[in-house]
């Protein structure tokens, strides 16, 4: 099939490469978000998907208003049979959705109807789900509600960050998307409506929402930190210093101190503990402002934290 591929971040690259290399499909163009400021100088840089497409001599479409009449006409002139979407990053209007005769097929990183929205992987980890997956479905105007073509499942490991899990889903999801498009091209695949029950939402997580709330139970905090790693990144105030947090540990490998009030900090020779709404959590790595991630105990000793300083 003649395909237009819509995607923006690195997460979309496995699917893009799979479709470019497929002998059954022809990626005639890539649709991605406009170049965005990057680095300290704020120089506009193309998205990972744009860079990958340009390296393969595939035309790149970067409309600032993808639902404008002008862009709908531009896409229509390309005459795609189907459009494949992986993390494009913009809502698609009715006119745009009506361009390809086989519609728009989205790869979403959850087992729909669970975790509709921008942050499904983060939501699954934070909720303590044991299993998640990826779903291909026909895009409709309403959010992630279209009929489903196929799914693939993935176990959530106890130490998975959102980055870890998304990396695996991007690869398995690429296979699923390719198989889905093969089935559509053959006329052998029919989408089925999503169940009405089991709908949950996963809106984008803000930087403020990634701030650790130490009054919560330790297991919830541990999951939430993994859920926002690497982006937007967990953080806390230690005194008046804003510190990013790497992994935290709730295990039997190291004996924790006695009970600590939420936010209270205890430092020994090898470890840093912070009190929660239940048992203390052990910090693995921290990133003070302007520095790289470092061992939490090394940082705490060097910073000579006052015993009265708390995390908040």
Swiss-Prot record:
Catalysed reactions listed for this entry: L-methionyl-tRNA(fMet) + (6R)-10-formyltetrahydrofolate = N-formyl-L-methionyl-tRNA(fMet) + (6S)-5,6,7,8-tetrahydrofolate + H(+)
SUPFAM superfamilies, sorted: FMT C-terminal domain-like, Formyltransferase
Entries under CDD domains matching the protein: FMT_core_Met-tRNA-FMT_N, Met_tRNA_FMT_C
Family in the record: Belongs to the Fmt family.
Top-rank EC class of the record's enzyme: transferase
NCBIfam families in the cross-refs: fmt (TIGR00460)
Binding site for (6S)-5,6,7,8-tetrahydrofolate: 110-113
Organism name: Mycobacterium marinum (strain ATCC BAA-535 / M)
Coiled coil residues, start to end: none
Keyword Protein biosynthesis appears in the UniProt entry: yes
Keyword Transferase found: yes
MF terms (GO), sorted A to Z: methionyl-tRNA formyltransferase activity
Gene3D superfamilies noted in UniProt: 3.40.50.12230
PANTHER family recorded: METHIONYL-TRNA FORMYLTRANSFERASE, METHIONYL-TRNA FORMYLTRANSFERASE, MITOCHONDRIAL
Name of the encoding gene: fmt
Sorted UniProt keywords: Protein biosynthesis, Transferase
Lineage of origin: Bacteria, Bacillati, Actinomycetota, Actinomycetes, Mycobacteriales
Cited Pfam families: Formyl_trans_C, Formyl_trans_N
EC number of this enzyme: 2.1.2.9
InterPro entries cross-referenced by the UniProt entry: Fmt (IPR005794), Formyl_trans_C (IPR005793), Formyl_transf_N (IPR002376), Formyl_transf_N_sf (IPR036477), Formyl_transferase-like_C_sf (IPR011034), Met-tRNA-FMT_C (IPR044135), Met-tRNA-FMT_N (IPR041711)
Protein name per the record: Methionyl-tRNA formyltransferase
This protein's GO CC annotations: cytosol
Function: Attaches a formyl group to the free amino group of methionyl-tRNA(fMet). The formyl group appears to play a dual role in the initiator identity of N-formylmethionyl-tRNA by promoting its recognition by IF2 and preventing the misappropriation of this tRNA by the elongation apparatus.
Superkingdom of the source species: Bacteria
